[in-house]
Amino acid sequence: VYVCLLSHWSPTRDDNLEEGIASSHAILGVKKSYVGDFGCMRFKDEDHHAIVRFIEAAIKDCQPEVLITHHPADVHVDHGITSECCLEAAKLPMRQICSVGPIKSILFMEVPSSTDWNINTSVGCFRPNAFMEVSQEDIRKKFDAISVYKDVIRNAPHPRSSNVLTSMAICRGSQAGAEYAEAF
């Protein structure tokens, strides 16, 4: 697993995000992280092509077969722009003569209390059509990885509580014919 973070700071956070990223990635077994310096709270003002080029550089380096990004209709502006830029960067093998093979799958992920908060339109809804079976251990690792970030995990009924995250995995699993699953 490789992770490309376009922004690693936010003026609204007071925790040590770099430590959280390192701890979270260690829990998940991330091989390499690509960390950009684009401003989280001013993403719409960033150079769009610079963001695409940063993602393309990560694609050239790790050569993924699967790219997972935010859903385009995510309520957070930076998540929507990230999704758009990832789609553009994924076309790299078609635009340039390079040694990068095609990306076989692009999956939009579900982010609790983010993907589901946007206006409900026929175009903007998260409607999963791909599921990845996960284990109870995977769910525990996900929860542990998220827990290293201050104020991300909340008490139920918040969408990012351990109870709700587990319930979502059970619900998505039932849709996929498995005990637990993640939806894309």
Task: For the regions a language model picked out, list residue spans one by one.
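Residue-level marker of intrinsically disordered, low-complexity segments enriched
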Residues: 3, 25-28
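A structural preference for short, hydrophobic beta-strand core positions in alpha/beta folds
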Residues: 3, 34-37, 108
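A short, flexible beta-alpha/helix-coil linker loop
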Residues: 8-9, 39-41
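Alpha-helical scaffolding within the catalytic cores
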Residues: 18-22
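A conserved beta-strand->alpha-helix junction
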Residues: 27-40
